[in-house]
Regions:
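Long, domain-scale non-catalytic interaction/scaffolding regions in large secretory-pathway
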Residues: 2-222
């Protein structure tokens, strides 16, 4: 402003600062409160011109003071998504942001966080967003420590994912498999099935996203 430029939206660093202060929740010093009081009204200006990452951060910040407006921002975030059964729900727009080392992970994780805070009952959309995040681990990886932490947070926030849950039931040709105890940490299980078996079925009763892999090994007669 000293140079004659009147900002219409907080800078990227200022936006991240307000976000962190919102999450922390502690009372701020008087001078910092004054700075925040200046920045907060700017969050409601020119939001249509901001990236989806910035819109998601803004929704989280406003969730405590203006939940109705924040919910409108989250609805906008949902309207920008596209859905594929195999990939889940994700952003296919330049407004989602992209870089060679981050891919679109930052936008996806902060959008999930905003949805978890403001529309926790919409588990279908959140789960579909998480599915894309998991699929990106396979194809693009979570290449930085920050992306990895944010991705894990996006899966665990607002859920009891680490609580004991019913195990999935594996069946071969409709007959339940008796499985040995899984190895610690990775949950690896090895068992033998008849060579003439045809169909493997996995039945899951717990909530949330589950993932795993099946490896088949056999001896070829000489």
């Amino acid at each position: 402003e000293k140079k004659g430029h009147k900002p219409t939206f907080p800078s990227f660093k200022a936006l991240q600062w307000i976000y962190l202060a919102t999450l922390d929740g502690r009372e701020l010093p008087a001078d910092v409160q004054a700075a925040n009081a200046y920045l907060m009204p700017l969050l409601k200006k020119e939001i249509k011109n901001q990236s989806l990452y910035e819109k998601a951060l803004t929704a989280i910040i406003l969730s405590k003071t203006e939940p109705k407006l924040a919910a409108e921002y989250v609805q906008s975030l949902k309207e920008y998504t596209v859905y594929r059964e195999d990939m889940g729900r994700y952003y296919d727009t330049p407004r989602a942001g992209y870089s060679w080392f981050d891919y679109k992970i930052p936008t996806q994780t902060v959008a999930i966080e905003a949805m978890q805070r403001l529309t926790p009952a919409d588990t279908e959309t959140i789960t579909e967003m998480q599915r894309w995040l998991l699929q990106s681990k396979r194809t693009q990886a979570w290449d930085t420590p920050i992306n990895s932490v944010n991705a894990v947070y996006a899966f665990l926030q607002g859920s009891n994912a680490l609580a004991p849950q019913a195990l999935s039931v594996l069946k071969v040709d409709e007959k339940p498999l008796e499985l040995p105890k899984a190895t610690a940490a990775i949950g690896y299980v090895k068992t033998n099935v008849p060579a003439e078996s045809k169909t493997l079925t996995i039945e899951k009763s717990s909530e949330g996203t589950s993932w795993g892999a099946v490896y088949a090994q056999f001896m070829q007669p000489s």
